[in-house]
Amino acid sequence: DGILKAKTEMFEQAMPGAQIIVNGDDDKLITLKSRTPKPTFFGLDSSLDLYAEHVENLGLGGSRCDFVTKAGRFTALIPIPGHHMVYNALAGTAVGLALGLTLREIQAGIEALKPVSGRNHLIHTEKWDILDDCYNANPVSMAASLDVLTNALGRKVAILGDMGELGENEKLLHYNVGCHAADDHIDAIFAVGELSRELVKGVQAKDPEGRLICRHFAAKAELLTAL
């Protein structure tokens, strides 16, 4: 609720005629539909102002879907993996329409997307495919990255570190990520850092039989030696 309050401060500061774009699939944000100025809502629900349908998961190759807007519809390939990227593309579509771009221009922009270092950046090497999503990680982004990893072929190894600035619930949030990781059918989980001990506890709680390889390291040097 505190985060919602902070995010809605923009309504109070918005200039007349301002356009505010929010995720309509978010249970908290959808409560803003009666606010002024009226937001534009995006998501996967067909009742929203713009939405995506027929979403096709292409694994590490990204996803393809149809974008439905009041100005028309188009199909686009999102070249960055992860279901959450559909929401990012929807948000970009809403902004593009607000700025007067054509649907063709928006489609071209989506298909030209390139990841930045540390944000869902797929690195191909002779031996491994590495998904680099380490910049300023939070529980939502880490869970999303783990979901992306499940789409990879071959053996899947997650190397996870501490997430900072999570407040008084930091241990529980790390524990929950561990539970999520155990459910994602990853072959091995290596965790490094003090808070990541809780992450390992979450994995072990969901995998009491030890099906997963799960190890904790106090420092990066120990992890590198093990790798």
Where are these regions (language model features)?
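Charged helix-capping and loop-helix junction motifs
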Residues: G2-A6, A143-L146, E170-A181
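Short acidic-hydrophobic, aromatic-tinged amphipathic segments that line or gate anion-handling sites
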Residues: L212-L223
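Residue-level marker for buried hydrophobic side chains located in beta-strands
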Residues: I130, A158-I159
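Glycine-rich phosphate/pyrophosphate-binding beta-alpha loops
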Residues: V116-G118, C134-A144
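Glycine-rich phosphate/diphosphate-binding loops that line cofactor/substrate pockets in enzymes
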Residues: V148-V157, L227
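Short, intrinsically disordered, charge-balanced linker/junction segments flanking boundaries
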Residues: D1, A221-L227
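Acidic, Mg2+-coordinating active-site environments of NTP-dependent enzymes
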Residues: D1-D129, G154, C179-A182, I186-A188, ...
